[in-house]
């Protein structure tokens, strides 16, 4: 096997810290063919669907990829923006804002965005970090609550890429940040602002992406971390019991998923006489199909049709300044102990040390 190395390595290269900001991914276009490619990649991940591979291959290729791409493409068409996929657009802005915030704090750190499925890929992002001289790598999946199907899958993808490298970097990963104070306060700020601008509903629905219940029973901590996030957020907002409720959305298939289901709960509230609700989705760092179409559009129609009168979706944190500060704090927390090009005497001193290293290497026969 040919491993990727530094055939043109310069011995005055300053080791840098690289941060891979990772997200799930998105189709490249709101078309059936693009959605088919995305679903084929996403649903082939054994972390996402834990079924025997031969059986699942038959279901996926014999049924799902034949009937689902067209209707899912229509859903994407309802939220597609001039600059493309909302998830990709917002994730890029998060990456750019995170880079700017780190720069403003005097950090010499390279940020790259990589998608688990689709483009820009994790492999491409890691290669760009390698070419920039990143010898210390922090993997930052934008999933506040850990699940094997998301964060675990990201680690698998990173490990697969690094297995092809000759010089593997030092590696760390932010596995979850569901109870981080900056993250919780950023969420609380967006909700308070919504209440101030448009009034407060009778109930706050705190909705997370669902998972099959058997994943919880198998030891996945996702459900517990969602519960903790919701409880801590409600406490920050001063909400009493009965003024808020956690729920889980986006289920597919026939098996039991985490409950209560968001659509069932919203319908029950409307039928019970609840007229005004606010909805927030703390598990989504950026807005995407599941928030903009499912929660902001489809479940709004369900609630109003069942007798509700006001339904307000509160957007994801996206590139809100409080969110970016929280993410930057997390990066700084997790790189403690790693030196940077602007530490240990500053950039000039570091550059001088690198040049001395190069001169010693040249004396030993190095090319550059």
Curated annotation (Swiss-Prot):
The protein's annotated pathway: Porphyrin-containing compound metabolism; protoheme biosynthesis; protoheme from protoporphyrin-IX: step 1/1
One example GO MF annotation: ferrochelatase activity
CDD domains per record: Ferrochelatase_C (cd00419), Ferrochelatase_N (cd03411)
Highest taxon of source: Bacteria
Major localization class: cytoplasm
Cysteine-cysteine disulfides: none
Entry GO terms, CC: cytoplasm
Signal peptide (residue range): none
Known EC number: 4.98.1.1
GO-annotated biological processes: heme biosynthetic process
SUPFAM superfamilies membership: Chelatase (SSF53800)
Reactions it catalyzes: heme b + 2 H(+) = protoporphyrin IX + Fe(2+)
Protein's UniProt keywords contain Zinc: no
Binding site for Fe cation: 209, 290
InterPro entries: Ferrochelatase, Ferrochelatase_AS, Ferrochelatase_C, Ferrochelatase_N
Main enzyme class: lyase
Region (Disordered): 341-368
Family: Belongs to the ferrochelatase family.
Stored NCBIfam families: hemH
Role played: Catalyzes the ferrous insertion into protoporphyrin IX.
Protein name as catalogued: Ferrochelatase
